[in-house]
């Protein structure tokens, strides 16, 4: 089978979903901007050679409905010969898009693909139109569909205190702010136009969601968001609501060499896993272990991890059971995570993979893992290797 490589990976800045910079920008525009951007950054790629576009999106309705992958590609002016499909594995959608494209390339059904994902949570709320089957309650607790309560459950099972959660959330904002100041995000963010607080058109170059003013005292003052009586999970220790998109240019190793394109990372292995829906946030643990086994690697071989921070109460148990608590500051989410940057559902998978690859390049790391939890009890993971 063919080796699959990433030759470029980018994202939009992350905008706040409530009155943020992208409040007048549609999800298709966020997506089309990156599709065009990848081709502009890589002029040696003939767009007519692209086989397919795999684009993650969770809430596939309103402006995100009717195959947003194809709509965005047409909006971007890409050749009509390029196929496009929208992928939904909830929070893991755009990482699943990478997995789908990788398999097509591995078996020779494609040479070049674009993957990515988008979610405009300001325009299409997370729970818009959701109607769970009543019969699910026979086998799954109703609270399993309420992500905040699953985080409460997982945190309690692992003895995660409110203080630990607040400290983790503070660190996320501090690391993300430092990454912004130091320019660590510059190589992955493709600036695009949005609107400032006065409604004026402006070029957005940095993430709007990060709160550098965050303090432990401020976090400690927040009320529990999901379980008012006994809870420990607050808005401050949960992933922010944000709008954004991410994308990658993926191809066979042979094609990259033929075009003279730099190979930024190779897809070493991939995995998904299911887990108890009531502790959906634990999914990264079995998914990561499965991916490492397929790659013939151990946890000790991995130099950097990107773990999507759905909640601090969810992230810390995963970090603990992956044996990373003692090296968390050196190995996990060096630039912060979704608590600071937000979690635009369909965007996040390739977003964290993009950040991982950039951090691997910056630090000289050879092996890295991107992994995330998925609503209703799943996990997804990808092992990347730099040449």
From Swiss-Prot:
Pathway: Lipid metabolism; fatty acid beta-oxidation. It comes from Aliivibrio fischeri (strain ATCC 700601 / ES114) (Vibrio fischeri). Pfam families: Thiolase_C, Thiolase_N. GO terms for biological process: fatty acid beta-oxidation; phenylacetate catabolic process. Transmembrane segments: none annotated. GO terms for molecular function: acetyl-CoA C-acyltransferase activity. Its EC number is 2.3.1.16. This is 3-ketoacyl-CoA thiolase. The gene is fadA. It catalyses: an acyl-CoA + acetyl-CoA = a 3-oxoacyl-CoA + CoA. Coiled coil: none annotated. The active site is at residues 91, 343, 373. One of its GO terms (cellular component) is cytoplasm. Heterotetramer of two alpha chains (FadB) and two beta chains (FadA). Belongs to the thiolase-like superfamily. Thiolase family. It comes from the Bacteria. It is found in: Cytoplasm.
């Amino acid at each position: 089978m063919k080796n699959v490589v990433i030759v470029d990976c980018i994202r939009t800045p992350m905008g706040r979903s409530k009155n943020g910079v992208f409040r007048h920008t549609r999800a298709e525009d966020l997506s089309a901007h990156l599709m065009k951007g990848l081709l502009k950054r890589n002029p040696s790629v003939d767009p007519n050679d692209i086989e397919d576009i795999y684009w993650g999106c969770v809430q596939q309705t309103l402006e995100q409905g009717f195959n947003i992958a194809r709509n965005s590609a047409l909006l971007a002016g890409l050749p009509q010969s390029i196929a496009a499909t929208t992928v939904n594995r909830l929070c893991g959608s755009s990482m699943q898009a990478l997995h789908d494209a990788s398999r097509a390339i591995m078996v020779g059904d494609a040479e070049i693909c674009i993957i990515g994902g988008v979610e405009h949570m300001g325009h299409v709320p997370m729970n818009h139109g959701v109607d769970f089957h009543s019969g699910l309650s026979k086998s799954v607790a109703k609270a399993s569909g309420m992500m905040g309560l699953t985080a409460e459950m997982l945190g309690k099972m692992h003895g995660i205190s409110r203080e630990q959660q607040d400290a983790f959330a503070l660190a996320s904002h501090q690391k993300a702010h430092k990454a912004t100041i130091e320019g660590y995000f510059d190589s992955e963010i493709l600036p695009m136009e949005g609107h400032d607080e006065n409604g004026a058109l402006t070029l957005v170059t940095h993430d709007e969601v990060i709160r550098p003013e965050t303090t432990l005292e401020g976090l400690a003052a927040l009320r529990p968001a999901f379980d008012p009586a006994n809870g420990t999970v607050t808005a401050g220790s949960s992933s922010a609501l944000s709008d954004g998109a991410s994308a990658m240019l993926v191809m066979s190793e042979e094609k990259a060499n033929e075009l003279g394109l730099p190979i930024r990372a190779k897809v070493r292995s991939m995995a998904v896993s299911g887990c108890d829906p009531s502790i959906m946030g634990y999914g990264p643990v079995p998914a990561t272990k499965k991916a490492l086994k397929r790659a013939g690697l151990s946890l000790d071989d991995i130099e950097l991890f990107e773990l999507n921070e759905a909640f601090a109460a969810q992230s810390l148990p995963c970090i603990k059971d992956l044996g990373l608590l003692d090296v968390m500051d050196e190995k996990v989410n060096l630039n912060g995570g979704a608590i600071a940057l937000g979690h635009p559902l369909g965007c996040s998978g390739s977003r964290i993979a993009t950040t991982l690859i950039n951090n691997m390049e910056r630090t000289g790391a050879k092996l890295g893992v991107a992994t995330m939890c998925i609503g209703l009890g799943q996990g997804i993971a990808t092992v990347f290797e730099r040449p």
